[in-house]
Amino acid sequence: MSVLTPLLLRGLTGSARRLPVPRAKIHSLPPEGKLGIMELAVGLTSCFVTFLLPAGWILSHLETYRRPE
């Protein structure tokens, strides 16, 4: 690295340091009521079907995805 590299990098990042960083204003309240058993069951089942079922299908059919040698 040359002697001018730190000066060049400082010149490139100097303008970025002065930019204001936007902050998210997130405010939430506690839930009005507790979740019931049926709501929990529906939520967990939908997560299982959405994420784990396709991954399990791919893993069970992994040999068909391999390239023939």
Swiss-Prot record:
Organelle transit peptide residues: 1-25
Presence of keyword Manganese: no
Mitochondrial matrix side: 26-36
Entry-linked SUPFAM superfamilies: Mitochondrial cytochrome c oxidase subunit VIIIb (aka IX) (SSF81431)
Location in the cell: Mitochondrion inner membrane
Keyword Membrane assigned: yes
Transmembrane region(s): 37-60
Pathway where this protein functions: Energy metabolism; oxidative phosphorylation
Any single GO BP term: cellular respiration
CDD domains for the chain: Cyt_c_Oxidase_VIII
Keywords: Membrane, Mitochondrion, Mitochondrion inner membrane, Primary mitochondrial disease, Transit peptide, Transmembrane, Transmembrane helix, Ubl conjugation
Membrane topology, from the record: Single-pass membrane protein
Major site of localization recorded for this protein: mitochondrion
Tissue expr: Widely expressed.
GO molecular function: cytochrome-c oxidase activity
Protein family per UniProt: Belongs to the cytochrome c oxidase VIII family.
Disease / disorder: Mitochondrial complex IV deficiency, nuclear type 15: An autosomal recessive mitochondrial disorder with onset in infancy. MC4DN15 is characterized by global developmental delay, poor feeding, metabolic acidosis, short stature, microcephaly, proximal muscle weakness, and distal spasticity. Additional manifestations include scoliosis, primary pulmonary hypertension, refractory seizures, and inability to walk. Serum and CSF lactate levels are increased. Patient tissues show decreased levels and activity of mitochondrial respiratory complex IV.
Function: Component of the cytochrome c oxidase, the last enzyme in the mitochondrial electron transport chain which drives oxidative phosphorylation. The respiratory chain contains 3 multisubunit complexes succinate dehydrogenase (complex II, CII), ubiquinol-cytochrome c oxidoreductase (cytochrome b-c1 complex, complex III, CIII) and cytochrome c oxidase (complex IV, CIV), that cooperate to transfer electrons derived from NADH and succinate to molecular oxygen, creating an electrochemical gradient over the inner membrane that drives transmembrane transport and the ATP synthase.
Subunit field text: Component of the cytochrome c oxidase (complex IV, CIV), a multisubunit enzyme composed of 14 subunits. The complex is composed of a catalytic core of 3 subunits MT-CO1, MT-CO2 and MT-CO3, encoded in the mitochondrial DNA, and 11 supernumerary subunits COX4I1 (or COX4I2), COX5A, COX5B, COX6A1 (or COX6A2), COX6B1 (or COX6B2), COX6C, COX7A2 (or COX7A1), COX7B, COX7C, COX8A and NDUFA4, which are encoded in the nuclear genome.
Protein name (record): Cytochrome c oxidase subunit 8A, mitochondrial
Organism: Homo sapiens
Taxonomy of the source species: Eukaryota, Metazoa, Chordata, Craniata, Vertebrata
